[in-house]
């Protein structure tokens, strides 16, 4: 089931990210409190919102959110 809003996600749901051509290029596992665990050079826990993954160290979005699928 594809979720309409990030607020509907729970820990364990999968978030998918695309590039500017619309190709899926990245996936992560949703955690609590709008965080995600994913591998981007190394395994990371970052913030996520309706735009995508925000890297606080780089102060920029690194991945554009395409959809979140309910897994649990």
Predicted regions and their residues:
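Short beta-strand or tight-loop elements
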Residues: 10-11, 64
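Catalytic cysteine-centered active-site loop
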Residues: 1-9
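Aromatic- and glycine-rich peptidoglycan recognition patches
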Residues: 3, 31-72
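Structural motif
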Residues: 12-14, 34
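Short gly/pro-enriched beta-turn/loop segments at secondary-structure junctions
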Residues: 9-10, 23
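A generic structural signal for residues embedded in beta-strands
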Residues: 16-17, 38
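Catalytic nucleophile-His microenvironment captured as a short glycine-rich beta-strand/loop
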Residues: 24-32
């Amino acid at each position: 089931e594809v979720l309409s809003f990030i607020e509907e996600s729970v820990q364990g749901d999968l978030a998918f990210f695309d590039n500017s051509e619309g190709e899926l290029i990245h996936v992560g596992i949703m955690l609590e409190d709008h965080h995600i665990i994913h591998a981007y050079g190394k395994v990371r826990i970052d913030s996520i919102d309706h735009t995508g993954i925000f890297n606080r160290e780089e102060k920029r979005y690194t991945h554009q959110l395409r959809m979140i699928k309910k897994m649990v």
